A protein has these predicted regions:
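Conserved acidic, metal-coordinating active-site core of Asp-based
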Residues: 95, 99-207, 211-216, 228
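Short acidic-hydrophobic, aromatic-tinged amphipathic segments that line or gate anion-handling sites
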Residues: 133, 240-243
Length: 252
């Protein structure tokens, strides 16, 4: 984009998406208006690239920080990718099996998991997505940028936090915990984007609702928390908007 005046980073679930995880026509129009005003819109999400392609097409947004900062896609190109080692995947897999949970593995092309349970189905129903294919050892031959422990809220969360201090865990919903490398976040994704593209002095705006948006707010000049946002995020916000189900982005 020539003569970029600002950059706006949008979380998806609970923010840009409506209550059924869809992009409304009003949001598509709002994104077009941002572009007309030389404001670059980017998605910043815990989801991965392959599962947000319909969202990107519907919204008109062609760049994204995905998997909580582990991967950056900018105008059709990969400009950053942080991958787990096979040994890290094996270790987490072993601990997850011991606790009776399942594990999902993410890269930009696909999602696969260790098994299907009621909790796994609930986790993906919660975000209106299909349950991933079962491929328990897919990490042996495929890249893994992010993992999810599929477990009920509060069910052994501390067990993982204590045993893997080198990782960061985000409990973003009642049925899953996002796992990224320590120090990686949506905020680090913003910094990596700016460093790679040589962007300096451009105002930044962050829109979000979840705990994983705290780092995004810290990395941007202005933070707009949705009305349905976590209280921790509202406390850090420059402005508090209405709920995502009340469709406020189109009025900005």
């Amino acid at each position: 984009m020539d003569k970029m005046k600002a950059i706006a980073f949008f979380d998806l679930d609970g923010t840009l998406l409506d209550g059924t995880s869809q992009i409304t026509p009003e949001i598509t129009a709002a994104v077009a208006a941002l572009k007309d005003n030389q404001i670059l819109p980017l998605i910043a999400t815990g989801r991965t690239l392959c599962e947000i392609q319909p969202i990107m097409k519907a919204s008109g947004i062609d760049s994204a920080i995905v998997m909580n900062g582990q991967f950056i896609h900018y105008e059709g190109k990969t400009i950053y990718s942080d991958e787990f080692t096979t040994e890290e995947c094996v270790s987490l897999h072993e601990h997850v099996k011991q606790r009776g949970h399942e594990l999902a593995f993410y890269n930009e092309r696909r999602i696969f998991c260790t098994g299907h349970t009621g909790t796994v189905k609930q986790a993906y129903d919660y975000i209106h997505s299909a349950v991933p294919e079962i491929d328990p050892t897919g990490y042996e031959n495929d890249a893994v940028n992010m993992m999810l422990v599929l477990s009920q809220h509060g069910d052994d969360d501390e067990y993982y936090y204590e045993r893997f201090p080198e990782l960061t865990f985000y409990r973003n919903g009642p049925f899953s915990i996002d796992i990224v490398r320590k120090g990686v976040s949506k905020g680090s994704g913003v910094k990596n984007l700016f460093n790679t593209l040589g962007l300096n002095g451009i105002p930044t705006y962050a829109f979000g609702d979840g705990i994983n948006d705290l780092a995004l707010f810290e990395a941007c000049d202005y933070g707009i928390a949705m009305g349905n946002a976590r209280e921790e995020l509202k406390e850090k916000a420059t402005f508090i908007s209405t709920k995502n189900t009340e469709r406020s982005e189109e009025r900005r």
